[in-house]
Amino acid sequence: MEDKEVRRYNEQRYNRKRQWYRVVLGVEQLCNYPLLNVIWVCLAIGMYVFERMVKRLMESFHVYSALQSVFNHCMIFIMIIIPIIFVIAIIRLLGYAAAVKDEADLQIVFGDKRNVKNNQMPILVHKKKDKSSGVTKREFYTTISMELWKESTEAICDIMNIHILGEITYGGRKKDKGNR
């Protein structure tokens, strides 16, 4: 029973990290590619049109005077919540679009390995292209051992059509994040 609970906990933890890193990657893509920020103009125009439609709709409803304030507050709440949901969805979609190809390539490389812990594939955390040198730097969150990464370096290069400059290393910004 404990093994199932541990497996379920690890799977939920992995999914939480994947969702969080999708948001982080989406925000990073908005910063790296300013042209994507046109999406916010489209969202603002769409919300303006939606607000006008809601006002017309509210005028056509005949609500009892006792419920009028509750109805108005509910409509204001909806007008606040819907843009927040759209913003989060757009950011997650951008993160997903940036990560899907790289993660799929790594799943092909590591998908048949029996010693991949809990069958959890690497999650793309950061992806940035250096404009001066043209080098794309990728950072993954993974539970796969360093030995397996080093054994699979050639397969990774072939499947992703890349050349790895330097060594594959552990660590995040402070070099203390062991799974990045």
Q: Where are the model-predicted features located?
A:
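Accessory regions of macromolecular translocation/handling assemblies
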Residues: M1-R180
